[in-house]
Amino acid sequence: KEDPWERLRKLKAGLPNTRLQMLLRGQNLLGYRHYSDDVVRAFVAKAAVNGIDVFRIFDAMNDVRNLRVSIEAVKAAGKHAQGTIAYTTSPVHTVEAFVKQAKAMQAMGIDSIAIKDMAGLLTPYATADLVRALKAEVDLPVFIHSHDTAGMGSMCQLKAIEAGADHIDTAISSFAWG
């Protein structure tokens, strides 16, 4: 039976100069149900000790209340807490709402912000507008992670760079399309 902590330690040993990152679903950790605060704190501490450096923390409903304990735990472990906006579209999911969310996460002590376009819904100009607004309103590095579901991922990345994004996520094509 595989031990994920052992695998993580081996990765860290083999990549000593690479910051390892994980996606953390806030109060849901790695799944789809809420866990108690003590379980969240213990999991984050264990992940940090075993080699995770950057925790990309999000809530699928963009409810920042579900991020607080994870952010506190990451900071207590001395690691990088990346607050994450789960991008989607609706009448209430506006640039202004996402900026408000980013400011709330900044007040919680995050180190950077990620725009997580998990469904590939971002369009190039929406990307530029959102990145520009975040850079103007929040004094933190902005990362973008997009999926190419609608074939616009690379253009969104370009527009993010042009609008001032600090980092973009990329993938090796032989792995990304497989």
Please provide the spans of the model-predicted regions.
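Active-site beta->alpha loop and helix N-cap motifs at the rims of alpha/beta catalytic domains
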Residues: 1-106, 110-112, 120-124
